[in-house]
Amino acid sequence: MQLRAFISVFASLACVNAAVIDHDQVVPFAQPTPTTTLQTLAVQYKPQIYIANGCHPYPAVDEDGNTSGGLKPTGSQSAGCKGSGYGSQIYGRAVAYEGVYAFMYSWYMPKDETLPGLGHRHDWEACVVWLDSLENPNVVALSASYHSTYLTYYPPDSDYLDGNSAKIEYSTSWVILDHLLSATSTSGETQDLIMWDQLTDAARTALEDTDFGDANVPFKDANFETKLANAYYT
C-alpha cells in the first residue's frame, strides 16, 4: 500500500473512533513552531478578537478528531461559554490569491445567540488579512465575516491595527439577528494558532465531515475558495 493511501485510510479509521464531546472538554492544539514562510507570517499577523457580547472562542476539534457538541441557545448570550479551561484556539489557512496573499483566520463559538432562546448551536466566524508580498509585507485590506458575506476594509484604518495584528470585534447584528465580525479600534485577546496544514489528519477530516448545523467551517476544502472570493476586497 502506498504511503499516501495508508495515511488516508489511517485518518479515516481515526475519524470513525472520534466522537462529539462537550464543548468545554475539547483540548486545543498548542501553537507549533512555524516551518514555512506562510506559517511564519500567519503567526506574525495573527489577529486579536474583542468579544463585545456572546460566546468566547473555543477549540472545535482535538488532535484525535473529537469535535465540539456546542451549546443550545439558552440563557444569556454568553451563558456556558465564557472561556474554556483548556484554552482557546484560532485556526488559519493561507494562500496566494489574485496577486496578493490571503491569510484566513477563524474562530469557533459553541453557540450563536442574539436573544434568550433565539439563535443556533455552533458559530464559525472568519477574517482575512490581505498582504501584498511575502518579503516585505504590508496589510492592504481586512475582511470580516458578516453572516454569509464579508465586510471589507480597503485600506484598513490605522486604528484597526495593533502593529501587525488586526483588531476584530465579535458582536450582535440586530439586522440579521446573528453575530458577526467587524474591524474595531478596541484591543482584544489572541489565541494559539493552528494552521490547516499543521492539523492532524484526524482533525482535518473531522472538520471536513462534521455537520455544524447552521454554521460552516470557512477554511475547509469544501468552502475555502468560495469564502475567499466572497471576502476579496476589490
From Swiss-Prot:
Which residues does the record list as glycosylated?
Answer: N66
What induces this one? Expression reached the highest levels at 3 days after inoculation of pepper leaves, followed by a gradual decline.
Q: What is its main location?
A: secreted
Q: Which UniProt keywords apply?
A: Glycoprotein, Secreted, Signal, Virulence
Organism's domain of life? Eukaryota
Family recorded in the similarity comment: Belongs to the Necrosis inducing protein (NPP1) family.
The entry's protein name is NLP effector protein 1
Higher taxonomy: Eukaryota, Sar, Stramenopiles, Oomycota, Peronosporales
